[in-house]
Structure formats: structure tokens, C-alpha cells
Amino acid sequence: MINISFPDGSVKQFAQNITAFEIVNAISMSLAKAAIVVEINGELKDLSTVIENDCKLRILTAQDYECLEIIRHDAAHLTAEAVKELFPETQVTIGPAIENGYYYDFARDKPFSIDDLANIEAKMQELSKKNEKITRELWDRDKAVEFFLSIGEHYKAKIIASIPEGEPITLYRQGNFIDLCRGPHSPSTGFVKHFKLMKVAGAYWRGNSRNEMLQRIYGTAWATKEQLDNYLFMLEEAEKRDHRKIGKELDLFHFQEEAQGMVFWHDKGWSIYNTIEQYIRKKIRKNGYIEVKTPVLVDKSLWEASGHWAKFRCDMFTLETDDKTLALKPMNCPCHVQIFKQGIKSYRDLPLRMSEFGLCHRNEASGALHGLMRVRSLVQDDAHIFCAEEQITDETVRFCKLLTEVYKDFGFTDIKVKFSDRSEICAGNDEVWDKAENALKTAIEKAGFIYTLNPGEAAFYGPKIEFVLTDAIGRQWQCGTLQMDFVLPERLDANYIAASGEKKRPVMLHRAILGSLERFIGILIEEYAGKFPIWLAPVQVAIATITNDLNDYALEVQKTLIDNGVRTDINISPDKINYKIREFSNQKIPIIAVIGKQEQANKQVTIRKLGTIEQEILSIEQLIAMIKKENSNYL
């Protein structure tokens, strides 16, 4: 007999060499029908797994988040099975689960059409309803290669040949389809019910551009219809909010081939950019930061000394001049260390909080560029805190408080925190890492955050905190970071004089709240759907006249507003007032000020806020006071 321990603490005895399914069925027949996989001693396994020894066992159903990846992997196999039935000449390659779905790569001469996708999805529904049993098979390596070659699946044969000797070759069979896979999988195709094929794209075999191009079918799959519907609605809403689309409609920015990944900021977009920079500058000054400016072009010798040349060389733009190699900086940190090193620093100078809106360049692959979200030229709200070890906790708490205030001002209150601890390869000794990790954990808790652990995901030079925002339609964006660094001060010989009189290395905290301003503006455009709050809107007040004889008064009002720092637009054309209001509303201007004869006579305007039909009559002074009050909360 073997002892099986369950999550509730109970222990049950079963005969040796029993399958996981038999155990589940013995507990509950209804649970056996719902079970997808089991977790045995922390590892996910098929229900067909034979259990020979005592173990801890957890039964997972569609209600457990771990099963979502299983369902998506099942859906990838279902897609491949459907493609092989409809297009038997097609070769299958790989099909993993990914975030929000899966993909499968196919080798086929003729491209898949939109109609083909619809037919494949219909065939998948048919195969799902058949509820074909999914079984795991262990094959001899040579036999597996011979089998796949015999059915014309040359890519599968190549994959098997690349698997290290000694590793088992496992295949999964469902109906007439068989695929190479590690698993685990659901017991049958009937567990895959809620899915949709999304698109077809090109993909190189093995991700290498020197290899042949394959066709990649992307799909999404979920545990329930409600989850699928919610996801599809989110995608539809995201398309409406796409910052590239809104950016064009509101005349904020553009890109062009002659400067790939570089933003052409238009007047209105640049207004948003400068307002955010002004806001952040005010915040950091209040929090004791100094602001600096460092060179954009720096000799490669500094990047070699810092270690960035070895790691980021391929992502850096370089040029040769006067027999020297210069690089456009991809980040600001080595330059900030150079400022820290100017003059002798004492423990009394710490913590030194050094900020910069630093212009950085990164040679991103052209295929990775995506509007404002992924660019080659970017400015970060970057700062580095040089401090003593005993100051780490207080500085981290202080930063977390500042970050929370900033996110709240932009409308983000759902903040998730991820903590990355040391990997197997790390600089420094365990004692230093223990202190650093404990200091950051204590600080996160003091700041009121609950964090999830990313085991082993820290950089080699220190532990890291990541801050993830959730937007209006449920998407998550990693923006803020705090990265502890023991290595760079050592590499670049930064030190300070401690109270004891000895030289010590400062700890360096790399921190950002927004990340890159370009990306954060892209996030804000989509968060607000272009409807910026008054303080941030590129045009705060739009003036519209009812008749042409009011134009002089309207221009006088505009001048008064501009003189008082109000960002203003005006339409004194002969167009109808309803047309003017509609046009300004389409431009998502937060306040429209209408001027008629009565408003002129009383030195007033009638305002209407975006998204409402309510009107309010204000004097020019009252309107200015309202805007200034709104601005003063942030600027």
C-alpha cells in the first residue's frame, strides 16, 4: 500500500501502481469527470500517470488557474489535428501555450486564408464534440524519427533528433492525430470548448531568420465561455483605444520609415509629454532629488568598464570618430556614477538621489517596434539613489510612497508588486544578498504592498521589485522598477567616506516610476481612450462662437486664457455651432466654451464638459480659477 497526502491534510492508502485517475475516481466520480490533471509532489502530471510510491497529490479542474495553460496546450493540438484533417499536405512543427492563448506553426506552400481559419475553427469544434481520448505514449527514439519521416513530418523528426540522449520521447495521440509533446494534457478533447482562432502570421523555423518561413496560427482558449467573451470584448475595446489610432485622430504624433522607432511629436502630443515631465519634476524635487543631465554619446571604454558593452553591445548604436568608438547610451546609470565620483563623498551626503530625463537609444529589432510602446529613442524618468546599506529599507519605503502617489494621480490604483530574488549566478556573497533581499521585503511590507515572488529572476547584481498597473480594461502593464545594485559602484570605483573614516562602496538603487515617457504616454492614451483629464489635456478649453459678429470677443477671451496659462483652441469660422461643438467633442477637449450675444454682453462663457450635456455659465475669471485649481493639484 502507498500513502497519498492531500492538500487538506488528509492521508489515504491505496494499492501500489494505481493511476491518478483511479485515485480521483475512488474519491468522487463527479470529480473524476471534472479533473484535468493532477499535481504530484509539485509537478503537473496526466491523470493516466501510475503512482508507485508515497506522494503529495492535488487534483486540478478547470477552476484552477494552472489548468488554463493545459487547456491552451490542448487547443494547440486540436488546431493541428484540424489542420491535418483539412489540409493533409501540411507539416506540423511546434505549438506552445502563451499568454492569453497559444500558437501553432505550420509548413505549407499555400498561405492560410481568412476562410481557412473559419473552416479550421469549425473543424476544431467538431473534434471537441467528439471528445476524443488523449493518451500519452512512450516511444523509442529511432522508431519515433522513422515514424514521423514516414508520414512526411520532417520537422518533428528534426525536433526529436535535437532532444538530448537519455530524455524520454513522449507522444500524445487523439483520434487519428499524434504529436510529439512533453505534456501533460487533459484526458480528452472535450475539455477544450471555449476557443477562437485569432490570426495568421509569419514565423521563422526555430526563430532564426536564416531558416524557412512558416505560418503561425494564433488562437485563444479559456476555461469558460464567460472568460472567452470577456477576453474578446477586451480585445475589441483595446482596438478602439489603440494609441496609434487615437494618436493620429488627435494629431499627437506620428512615425515614418526614415526614422523607424523614433517619435515625431506634434504640438498636442508634445504638450502632454512636457506636462508629464513638469509633473514628475515637481514630485521628485519635493522628495529630495537633484536633477542632472548627462551626455548622449559616450566612449565605449565607459561601457566596457560598466559591463554594458559585453551584455548590450548588439542593442547599442555606435559610431567611429577620431579613432574612437562612441555609443549612444542605452541607459543612464554609468553616467550618473561619474557625477557621484566628482569630489569626495561623505556618509553625510547619503542618500544622494540623482534624477535625469535621460535620452536613451536602443537598437530594437524593426519587427519588435510597436508605436509608442516599443521605440528606439526613449526618455526615462530615471533616477539612482546612492545610499548606505542601512538606508536601503527607508529609501525603498520612500520610493514606494512616491510611486503610489504618482500612479494615483494618473488614475491607477490597482498596483501589483513582483519581487525577484537571487538566481544561481549572482555577484556578491550570500550574506550580502540576504541583507539586501530582507531589506527590500521589509520595505515592500512597510509600504503596504503584498508581493508575489519571482524566484531566481533577479539580475546578477541585485534583487529587484517590479510594479504592475492594471488599466481600465483589465490589461496589466509593468512600469515601475526598483533594482538594487552592488556591482556597478564596484566596477566604476564609486565610494564614500564612512563615519569611521574608512572608504565604503555605496549601494546603488536604480528606480523608475513611469519607465519610458513614450511608453507611459501610450498607456495613458489607451487608459483614457484619448479623454485626458483637464490638467493633462493638450487643449483644456475650446472656444466656439455662435455667430461671426462675436469673433472679436472670442479672441479677447482666448488671449486672456492663454495669458493665464490655459491651453486653448478656438473656432470662429462661419460653421454652425453644433458642428463646432461636435468637432471639439471628437477631439476630446475637456471643456467647450460657447460664446453667444448674452455671453458677450455679460463678459461670460457657457461651458460644457466633455461627455455631459449639462451647461454652466461662468465669468472668464471663474473659468480661469477652475482650470488653475485643477492644474495646481498636479503641477
From Swiss-Prot:
Binding-site list for Zn(2+): 333, 384, 510
Any one GO BP annotation for this protein: threonyl-tRNA aminoacylation
Listed InterPro entries: aa-tRNA-synt_IIb, aa-tRNA-synth_II, aa-tRNA-synth_II/BPL/LPL, Anticodon-bd, Anticodon-bd_dom_sf, Beta-grasp_dom_sf, TGS, TGS-like
KW Metal-binding (keyword) present: yes
Catalytic activity line of the entry: tRNA(Thr) + L-threonine + ATP = L-threonyl-tRNA(Thr) + AMP + diphosphate + H(+)
GO molecular function, one term: metal ion binding
Region: Catalytic, residue numbers: 242-533
UniProtKB keywords: Aminoacyl-tRNA synthetase, ATP-binding, Cytoplasm, Ligase, Metal-binding, Nucleotide-binding, Protein biosynthesis, RNA-binding, tRNA-binding, Zinc
Cellular component GO terms, alphabetical: cytoplasm
Cross-referenced Pfam families: HGTP_anticodon, TGS, tRNA-synt_2b, tRNA_SAD
PANTHER family membership: THREONINE--TRNA LIGASE, CHLOROPLASTIC_MITOCHONDRIAL 2, THREONINE-TRNA LIGASE
Subunit structure as annotated in this protein's UniProt entry: Homodimer.
Assigned EC number: 6.1.1.3
Domain TGS span(s) in chain numbering: 1-61
Broad enzyme group: ligase
Cellular localization per UniProt: Cytoplasm
Protein known as: Threonine--tRNA ligase
Superkingdom, taxonomy of origin: Bacteria
Family statement drawn from the similarity comment of this UniProt entry: Belongs to the class-II aminoacyl-tRNA synthetase family.
